[in-house]
Amino acid sequence: MSHSSSGAPLDPVAFIHSQIRTVPDWPQPGVMFRDITTLLQSPKALRILVDLFVERYVDAKLDYVAGLDARGFIIAPIVAYELSVGFVPIRKVGKLPYKTRSESYELEYGSATVEIHEDACKPGDRVIIMDDLIATGGTMMAGRNLLERLGAVVVEGAAIIDLPDLGGSALLRNAGLPVYTVTEFAGH
């Protein structure tokens, strides 16, 4: 376990939380954007973050880690690599070159559609879905729906940050999807 400068053991969750920058009024007034770039710039923080996810899923017998476009693409492939499983991209509409399945959803500030290659996984494959944060839960729910339409077993939804006041993690859990997040922030 890492230690703080005082020699006390470092709480990995508190450390991860401290490495996330809040940008007020971005991308629109009233939104408190949780910026993970500061977390990713720190080799120590990135290692701790990846280790938290790997420790959680090392015995989950996964076949894939699916990442949600776009910030889910940052952490999901690293976790997939560390777990020696494949990575499945779930992209914004029009970005995948092969035959796709699509799903539309509502998000914190608008609506969108995501797609997955129709051969991204096969029936019975065990998958987790990853993103940087859970706000309204729409993106992750759409990803889950796509994976399940392909026959995959979605083991859990995972994110660095939960914004519980926006209700997404509760929505996902109420829909039967277990959710794991490293930290949470109140408000938007």
Curated annotation (Swiss-Prot):
Keywords carried by this UniProt record: Cytoplasm, Glycosyltransferase, Purine salvage, Transferase
PANTHER family per record: ADENINE PHOSPHORIBOSYLTRANSFERASE, PHOSPHORIBOSYLTRANSFERASE DOMAIN-CONTAINING PROTEIN
Quaternary structure (record): Homodimer.
Pathway(s) the chain acts in: Purine metabolism; AMP biosynthesis via salvage pathway; AMP from adenine: step 1/1
Similarity remark: Belongs to the purine/pyrimidine phosphoribosyltransferase family.
Domain of life: Bacteria
This enzyme's EC code(s): 2.4.2.7
Protein role: Catalyzes a salvage reaction resulting in the formation of AMP, that is energically less costly than de novo synthesis.
Recorded name of the encoding gene: apt
Protein name: Adenine phosphoribosyltransferase
One GO BP: AMP salvage
One Pfam family from the record: Pribosyltran
Stored CDD domains: PRTases_typeI
Molecular functions per Gene Ontology: adenine phosphoribosyltransferase activity
Catalysis: reaction(s): AMP + diphosphate = 5-phospho-alpha-D-ribose 1-diphosphate + adenine
Subcellular location(s) of the protein: Cytoplasm
Major localisation: cytoplasm
Any one GO CC term of the record: cytoplasm
